[in-house]
Amino acid sequence: AILTKINADSKSVVSNMIAKECKRRNIPCHIINTSEAWVSKNDLEKGTLLVSNIDGEDTEIEFELSKTICFTRAGVLEDETGLALLSTFENAGAFMINTRNGMLTCDNKMSAYISFERDNIPTPRTALISNEKSLLDAHKRIGGNYPVIMKTLTGTQGIGVSIIESEKSLVSVAQSLWKFGAALLLQEFMKFDFDIRTIVVDGRILAST
C-alpha cells in the first residue's frame, strides 16, 4: 500500500515508480489517496483493514496487515485525515516505511537535529530562532561566523534555505520571513564542493545519490 496525498499539483512520481516496479514483480500494489479514502472496517480478529474509495472512484480494497508493507509519502503529514490513515495502518500491524513518529521527526529540521545529537551523529551546530534577541544569541552559539545558513523548519529540495553573509542580512532576512509566520533555525555553514545523500543502516551504506 502507498499512502499519498494526490492533488492537482502532484504527479506522485515516486508512488508511480513503486507501483510500476511492484507490477513488474507481480506484487499487488495499491495507491491510496488520503484526501479521498477512509477505513470502513478494522477487523482485529482477522487482522484486516477494509479501505474504501482509495482512488476517489469508489474502489474498495481489503488489506491483510501481516502481509502489508505501507509506504508513506510526505504529503500525508499535511492534514489530520492523512495522519489518521497512517496511524490506523501502523497501529493495525502493517510494516511501515516510515512510521508516523519517524516521518514527523524528519519533517521538522530541529527535531531531526535533536535526534542526531541524542544519538551522537555529527551534524552542523544548529539553533532555533524566534525573535531578534534569540537570533543574535543563536548566531554566537553556533560559532559566530559568516556565512551562516538560515532555514525554515520544514521544506525540501533547498526551499526555504538562505546563505547569510552579514549581520545586517541576518536580521533583514529573518524579519522578512517572520512576517509570513515562518519558524526558523540557524545552522553552521560547512564549505564543501558537493554533497552525497546516503541511506545507512547499521553502519552500512545501502543506497546513495
Residues covered by each model-derived region:
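Short hydrophobic segments within beta-strands
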Residues: L3-K5, V201
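Conserved N-proximal alpha/beta basic substrate-recognition cap immediately N-terminal to
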Residues: I6-R125
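Structural detector of well-ordered beta-strand residues that form the stable sheet scaffold
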Residues: M96-I97, P124, I149, L185-Q187, ...
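Generic beta-strand structural signal
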Residues: N98, L128, V200-V201
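Short acidic/polar capping segments at secondary-structure boundaries
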Residues: N101-M103, S130-L135, L153-Q157, E167-S169, ...
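ATP-grasp fold ATP-binding core
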Residues: F116-E117, I142-I159, G181-D193
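Rossmann-like NAD(P)H-binding beta-loop-alpha module
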Residues: P122-N145
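Phosphate-binding site of ATP-dependent enzymes
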Residues: I159-T209
